[in-house]
Swiss-Prot record:
Family membership noted in the UniProt record: Belongs to the ThiG family.
Protein name stated in the entry: Thiazole synthase
Keyword Protein transport set for record: no
Record GO terms (molecular function): thiazole synthase activity
Subunit structure: Homotetramer. Forms heterodimers with either ThiH or ThiS.
Job of this protein: Catalyzes the rearrangement of 1-deoxy-D-xylulose 5-phosphate (DXP) to produce the thiazole phosphate moiety of thiamine. Sulfur is provided by the thiocarboxylate moiety of the carrier protein ThiS. In vitro, sulfur can be provided by H(2)S.
Pathway: Cofactor biosynthesis; thiamine diphosphate biosynthesis
Gene Ontology cellular component list: cytoplasm
Reactions catalysed according to its record: [ThiS sulfur-carrier protein]-C-terminal-Gly-aminoethanethioate + 2-iminoacetate + 1-deoxy-D-xylulose 5-phosphate = [ThiS sulfur-carrier protein]-C-terminal Gly-Gly + 2-[(2R,5Z)-2-carboxy-4-methylthiazol-5(2H)-ylidene]ethyl phosphate + 2 H2O + H(+)
Upper classification of the organism: Bacteria, Pseudomonadati, Pseudomonadota, Gammaproteobacteria, Vibrionales
Source organism per UniProt: Aliivibrio salmonicida (strain LFI1238)
Annotated positions binding 1-deoxy-D-xylulose 5-phosphate: G159, A185, G186, N207, T208
Location of the active site: K98
Length: 256
């Protein structure tokens, strides 16, 4: 049994957060989210009609009892992100926000300057801000200092499925963070998610690897188990890596 995750005084028993894009249909999306055990699902504000409770994305999440994490994907600067956040809060009655600002549509790299600027203002306005950002230890510390409830550094570019290519920087971020660290983007296999948890990440967010799988519902189960396994291993002390062989049995001669 692992310890619960706390973000902004809200407890989560699952450390797997999920996205809602790229699923074949809304029913499969709902089934996968439920099977994943996730308690927090993010959705792009540009893809939903927040004023319509029957929306194909919004309704399945809400009827499944999963908490909403609106995101500002598509915003190109702080001004656009703040405007989108204000609309979401009014329509959905939530202060929770995944802040995403990526002006380049080809690589979807988060803009660090605009993200920090928007985060500071949104925190001032009372939002619970979870910013998607580069795996930059200095930036993550600055985001923490302006009041973000967690930081969400990337493991690899969005949708790349490359896994944890930013390991060295993630380890620094995790080591110095005083808020939860949620590894977001690039996680393409359950083993990637388990590895992120073994490094000490507090949670992971997975979308493409579940939604685009041949069987998204079964893949959601695989990720649920991987996250649980990785966190359990981290909490109970992984053995250190050695460049030499270390015997597990006595080294005395066989006939002694």
């Amino acid at each position: 049994m692992t310890q619960p995750l706390i973000i902004a005084n809200t407890p989560f028993s699952s450390r797997l957060f999920t996205g809602t894009g790229k699923f074949p249909n809304s029913l499969i999306m709902q089934q996968a989210l439920i099977e994943s055990g996730s308690e927090l699902a993010t959705m792009a504000l540009k893809r939903v009609d927040v004023s319509n409770p029957e929306d194909d994305i919004l309704k399945p999440i809400m009827t499944a009892g999963i908490n909403l994490l609106p995101n500002t994907s598509g915003a190109k600067n702080a001004r656009e992100a703040i405007f989108a956040a204000q609309l979401a809060r009014e329509a959905l009655q939530t202060n929770w926000l995944k802040l995403e600002i990526h002006p380049d549509p080809k690589y979807l790299m988060p803009d660090p300057i605009e993200t920090l600027k928007a985060a500071e203002e949104l925190v001032r306005q009372g939002f619970i801000v979870l910013p998607y950002c580069h795996a930059d230890p200095v930036l993550c510390k600055r985001l923490e200092e302006v009041g973000c409830a967690a930081v969400m550094p990337l493991g690899a570019p969005i949708g790349s499925n490359k896994g944890i290519v930013s390991r060295d920087f993630l380890e620094i971020i995790i080591d110095q963070a005083k808020v939860p660290v949620v590894v977001d983007a690039g996680i393409g296999a359950p083993s990637h998610a388990a590895f992120a948890m073994e490094l000490g990440a507090d949670a992971v967010l997975v979308n493409t690897a579940i939604a685009a799988a041949r069987n998204p519902v079964a893949m959601a189960t695989a990720f649920k188990l991987a996250v649980q396994s990785g966190r359990l291993a981290y909490e109970n002390g992984l053995v250190s890596v050695s460049s030499q062989a270390v015997a597990s049995s006595p080294l005395t001669a066989f006939l002694d």
